[in-house]
């Protein structure tokens, strides 16, 4: 059977990606109405201002669209560095969404990594490695997706 990625990562983005051959499962995980959280670490050029942090948390206007609110925390914003590390959790996953959110606020994303899809993390995996999800993990994702639908 054909195995395909569940969702996508931009060419310049690394991190967690689920692969599946189940079309129904893929739709459950990728459709925004199911509210499956994806967590990223973004390294942005410049210091993230408080007012921009608030905008990220309430939704960013991109063209004629306003994103859903993101859960955002500053991981590292040293005085000596001109860059900021930010952890964001979103559930929409539109094309280049995080990069476009920061660009709309005047920041360049220098590096972007998806750390987690819901509770599934990269913990214990090196770059390029993979593992098979347990039945419990798959059921948990399906339950979350079904409960997230409004």
Predicted regions and their residues:
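Basic, flexible Lys/Arg- and Gly-enriched helix-loop patches that mediate nucleic-acid binding at interfaces
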Residues: 1-150
């Amino acid at each position: 059977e054909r195995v395909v990625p569940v969702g996508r990562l931009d060419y310049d983005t690394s991190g967690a990606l689920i692969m599946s051959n189940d079309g129904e499962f893929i739709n459950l995980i990728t459709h925004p109405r199911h509210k499956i959280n994806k967590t990223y670490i973004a390294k942005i050029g410049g210091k993230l201002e408080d007012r921009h942090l608030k905008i990220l948390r309430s939704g960013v206007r991109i063209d004629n669209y306003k994103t859903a609110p993101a859960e955002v925390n500053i991981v590292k914003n040293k005085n000596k560095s001109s860059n900021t590390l930010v952890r964001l959790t979103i559930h929409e996953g539109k094309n280049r969404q995080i990069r476009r959110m920061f660009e709309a606020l005047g920041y360049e994303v220098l590096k972007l990594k998806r750390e987690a899809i819901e509770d599934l993390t990269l913990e214990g995996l090196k770059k390029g490695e993979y593992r098979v999800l347990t039945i419990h993990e798959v059921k948990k994702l399906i339950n979350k997706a079904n409960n997230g639908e409004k």
